[in-house]
Amino acid sequence: MDSITSAASVVAAGLAVGLAAIGPGIGQGTASGGAVEGIARQPEAEGKIRGTLLLSLAFMESLTIYGLVVALVLLFANPFA
């Protein structure tokens, strides 16, 4: 792999992780804020709200993990060889 392709892979890997973390990070903050607000309004529903929140946070975090997998493939699997 030549140096330009190697440099482009490193830049693309950085962008993949960075951009894949922005959306879920904003979504997780919004969801957590909504959950805290919902628990403050209705404390007796805390268990149900917490369970739903944790499930949705796991789904959001999976998007970030997909970005990490793409970055690792770009760095170590050498798809351009």
Curated annotation (Swiss-Prot):
Annotated compartments: Cellular thylakoid membrane
Organism of this sequence: Synechococcus sp. (strain CC9902)
Topology in membrane: Multi-pass membrane protein
PANTHER family: ATP SYNTHASE LIPID-BINDING PROTEIN, MITOCHONDRIAL, ATPASE PROTEIN 9
Function field: F(1)F(0) ATP synthase produces ATP from ADP in the presence of a proton or sodium gradient. F-type ATPases consist of two structural domains, F(1) containing the extramembraneous catalytic core and F(0) containing the membrane proton channel, linked together by a central stalk and a peripheral stalk. During catalysis, ATP synthesis in the catalytic domain of F(1) is coupled via a rotary mechanism of the central stalk subunits to proton translocation.
Keyword Transport in annotation: yes
Protein name, UniProt field: ATP synthase subunit c
PROSITE patterns: ATPASE_C
Matching Pfam families: ATP-synt_C
Cellular component terms (Gene Ontology): plasma membrane-derived thylakoid membrane; proton-transporting ATP synthase complex; proton-transporting two-sector ATPase complex, proton-transporting domain
Swiss-Prot/TrEMBL keywords: ATP synthesis, CF(0), Hydrogen ion transport, Ion transport, Lipid-binding, Membrane, Thylakoid, Transmembrane, Transmembrane helix, Transport
Keyword Transmembrane appears in the UniProt entry: yes
Site annotation Reversibly protonated during proton transport: residues: 61
GO MF: lipid binding; proton-transporting ATP synthase activity, rotational mechanism
Subunit structure: F-type ATPases have 2 components, F(1) - the catalytic core - and F(0) - the membrane proton channel. F(1) has five subunits: alpha(3), beta(3), gamma(1), delta(1), epsilon(1). F(0) has four main subunits: a(1), b(1), b'(1) and c(10-14). The alpha and beta chains form an alternating ring which encloses part of the gamma chain. F(1) is attached to F(0) by a central stalk formed by the gamma and epsilon chains, while a peripheral stalk is formed by the delta, b and b' chains.
Entry-linked InterPro entries: ATP_synth_csu_bac/chlpt, ATP_synth_F0_csu, ATP_synth_F0_csu_DDCD_BS, ATP_synth_F0_csu_sf, ATPase_proteolipid_c-like_dom, F/V-ATP_Csub_sf
Lineage top rank: taxon: Bacteria
Record-stated family: Belongs to the ATPase C chain family.
Sequence intervals crossing the membrane: 7-27, 57-77
